[in-house]
């Protein structure tokens, strides 16, 4: 399973990319707004930022449209895709989003359909030509449903139906979600910087390393 960072923060991407385990990045309008801390964006400023994200990520970067109607989504998606070969256009899973997905995918532009909360939505997205579908585990858990079960259904359906789509486990809240996604067969898990860091931490690792160093200090030359 590939590991993506869910952020638009260049420093966060730079830090995790240095580990040698990062395969891509996902962004959304909220994350972009957070990265610019209330700055009023121009297209030139946004495009420069997304290009920088692509260079740091070294793999697919999902950039989401802000338009709500299909025709405008397609136009915005084309502009985003033209910025860098790594750009994947992110669309909401709505009627207009499906129309835009079909049009963009027909032009050879990769699409990530987001805000997926049911297996049927994932099926529709795949049939519309999406390259990726992004079920939201954490938000499903928040309403007392089972995000893991949703992911299991989508992965199983993809296999049974032989759908040419990759499944991104999204809305990941904690390391257990990552383990669950890997065990359930997700192709990709995308997570915030804090969760990525938490994957590595374990108190017994710290304790063991400290003990090794203490013992070494007793005998080193």
What role is predicted for each listed range?
Residues 3-5, 9-13, 19-21, 27-103, ...:
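Active-site beta->alpha loop and helix N-cap motifs at the rims of alpha/beta catalytic domains
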Residues 4-6, 62-69, 86-95, 109-124, ...:
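Catalytic beta/alpha-barrel core
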Residues 11-19, 72-76, 100, 118-128, ...:
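Catalytic cores of alpha/beta
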Residues 20-24, 83-87, 103-112, 127-134, ...:
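Glycine-enriched alpha-helix->loop->beta-strand junction motifs that scaffold or abut catalytic
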Residues 24, 29-34, 115, 132-143, ...:
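Glycine-rich phosphate-binding active-site loops on the catalytic face of alpha/beta enzymes
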Residues 28, 89, 125, 181, ...:
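Conserved, mostly hydrophobic/aromatic
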Residues 44-61, 81-82, 98-111, 146-167, ...:
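Alpha-helix-loop-beta-strand connector modules within alpha/beta enzyme cores
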Residues 158-221:
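C-terminal alpha-helical cap/extension of soluble enzyme domains
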């Amino acid at each position: 399973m590939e590991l993506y960072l869910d952020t638009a923060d260049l420093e966060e991407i730079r830090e995790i990319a240095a580990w040698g385990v990062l395969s891509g990045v996902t962004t959304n309008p909220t994350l972009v707004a957070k990265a610019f801390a209330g700055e009023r964006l121009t297209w030139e400023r946004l495009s420069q930022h997304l290009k920088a994200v692509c260079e740091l990520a070294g793999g697919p970067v999902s950039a989401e449209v802000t338009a709500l109607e299909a025709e405008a989504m397609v136009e915005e998606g084309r502009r985003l895709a033209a910025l860098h070969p790594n750009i994947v256009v992110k669309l909401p899973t709505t009627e207009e989003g499906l129309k835009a997905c079909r049009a963009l995918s027909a032009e050879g532009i990769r699409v990530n359909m987001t805000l997926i909360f049911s297996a049927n939505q994932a099926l529709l997205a795949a049939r519309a030509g999406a390259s990726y579908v992004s079920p939201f585990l954490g938000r499903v858990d928040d309403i007392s449903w089972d995000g893991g079960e949703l992911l299991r259904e989508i992965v199983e359906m993809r296999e049974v139906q032989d759908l040419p789509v990759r499944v991104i486990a999204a809305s990941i809240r904690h390391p257990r979600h990552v383990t669950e996604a890997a065990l359930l067969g997700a192709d990709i898990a995308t997570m915030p910087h804090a969760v990525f860091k938490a994957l590595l931490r374990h108190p017994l690792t710290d304790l063991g390393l400290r003990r090794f160093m203490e013992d070494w200090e007793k005998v080193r030359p």
